[in-house]
Amino acid sequence: MEQIADLIRKLDAADYVMLTVHTGAQARYYYDRFPEILLSVFARNWKEYEDIAISGVPWKNMIAYVGPSINDENRKIVDLLHSHGVRCMLSVAPTHDKLASAADRHSKYLMEIATHPDIIESDIPTEVNDALKAQAK
């Protein structure tokens, strides 16, 4: 972490980077050094949510990775994060992006879009965009 902090400082990059952190302690480490930095925090379950919540890092400094989908298991966490003004991100890269056919991927993307994530991370953003356009019609 120290090397990353040194690089951010050297490049004066705190205003235009977002760091992914996996624990509240990591979030606090970077926040203490760069109070305006944006952090992508892990909040896939209650344990991770609580770890971030007690870190003392302001909610305004966070977006939250909630897993590969928004579902019954994490919906309450997503709602709680939203109540704090935190945008929630899911990642389809390790799941839907790996499906062999574009039609299958499109169908899965539409399922995720229906859960209203704030951010969708994908290795095939053009296909996610096509699904977003199709859903909007």
What does each model-identified segment do?
Residues M1, L7-A13, T20, V78-H82, ...:
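Secondary-structure boundary/capping motif
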Residues M1-K10, Q26-V41, W46-V57, A100-A103:
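Distinct, well-ordered alpha-helical segments
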Residues K10-A14, R33, S83-H84, T115:
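Alpha-helix C-cap/termination motif
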Residues L11, F34, L132-A136:
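Active-site catalytic pocket residues across diverse enzymes, especially alpha/beta-hydrolases
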Residues D12-L19, I37-L39, H116-I119:
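Short active-site oxyanion
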Residues L19-H22, I70:
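Alpha-helix N-cap/loop-to-helix boundary motif
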Residues A25-Q26, E127:
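Alpha-helix capping/helix-boundary segments
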Residues F42-K137:
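C-terminal active-site rim and adjoining tail of enzyme catalytic domains
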